[in-house]
Each structure stands twice: as C-alpha cells, then as structure tokens.
C-alpha cells in the first residue's frame, strides 16, 4: 500500500477510507426505505444512509442521515452490519433502529419515502449491494427471531 510521506520531515499524509452510516428502521413489521433523488443510483431504493461527518459518532450519523433523507426520527437498537469495501475505500455501517414517528416524506435527497413489508421490497431496484445484503440478513434473522451483528469484506474479483 502506497503512503505519501514528506522526504524532508517524514510527515505521513494519510488518505483514509470514508465511512458510510445508515439505519434499517422498523415500524410495525415494516422497513423504511427511500428512493434516491441524487446520484449515484438516482431513482433506486435504499436504506437511509450517507457519509459520516466530522465530530459525530456512528450512531449520531445514522440518526442524522435517517432524518436528512426521510424527515423522520429513529432510535438505534443495535449495530447490525458492517462491510469493508477496500476497492472504493469505504466502510459501510448499518444499525437496526426503531422508527419513532411516521412523519416521513420526500426530501432533497429522496424523491419518495415509504414503509415496505418484506414481500413488497423491490429487489431489482435496490441501489447498493450493502443495502441488499443488510435486507437479506434481516429477513434471515427475522425468520429465527435472532438478530446478530455481521461483519463482511466485499472485494472486487
């Protein structure tokens, strides 16, 4: 791995991965999803998620992104999935969360916001592989009523 270092003072100039945080928000057996109104993947469905900001925790970022993308408030239940994506220098972290209200709706970032029952999920219109995997894990865990944290590396082959 290449590092940029000053030859005179040996200071290392780090280029670090970006962290994406999000939430699988639940309300009465339904999952909150947003149709992206911005690129990349405009017009496809996702869980509320986005890049972490400075001076916030992972949980704060997931709650903020949920509000920014849906207009609704959430409360974190537990860390749920974490994906390392070294080929794009990102880490994606999703939490299970309770949706605290149904005051959701379109935002600048989302053209549509909707609660989906599991059998209503539009699998061919999911924006990102990490969102799809998180939803698949949720369905598996729901069937056995045991929700576990998963960490996975996704590498291009």
Language-model segments: residues:
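Generic beta-strand structural signal
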Residues: 25-26, 84
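Conserved hydrophobic/aromatic beta-strand scaffold that supports enzyme active sites
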Residues: 3, 24, 33, 94-96, ...
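Conserved Nudix-box catalytic region and its N-terminal flanking loop in Nudix hydrolases
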Residues: 26-68
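Short connector loops at helix/strand junctions that flank enzyme active sites
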Residues: 16-20, 26-28, 40-42, 47, ...
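Unchanged
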Residues: 52-76, 81-137, 146-147, 156-157
């Amino acid at each position: 791995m290449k590092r940029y270092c000053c030859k005179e003072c040996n200071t290392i100039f780090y280029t670090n991965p970006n962290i994406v945080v999000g939430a699988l928000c639940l309300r009465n057996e339904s999952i909150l999803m947003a149709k992206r109104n911005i690129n990349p993947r405009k017009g496809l469905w996702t869980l509320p998620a986005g890049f972490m900001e400075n001076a916030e925790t992972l949980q704060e970022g997931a709650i903020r992104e949920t509000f920014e993308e849906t207009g609704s408030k959430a409360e974190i239940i537990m860390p749920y999935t974490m994906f390392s994506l070294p080929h794009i220098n990102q880490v994606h972290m999703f939490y299970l969360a309770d949706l605290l209200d149904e005051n959701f709706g379109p935002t600048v970032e989302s053209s549509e916001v909707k609660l989906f029952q599991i059998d209503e999920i539009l699998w061919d219109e999911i924006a990102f592989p990490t969102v799809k995997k998180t939803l698949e894990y949720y369905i598996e865990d729901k069937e056995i009523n045991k929700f576990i944290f998963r960490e996975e590396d996704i590498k291009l082959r």
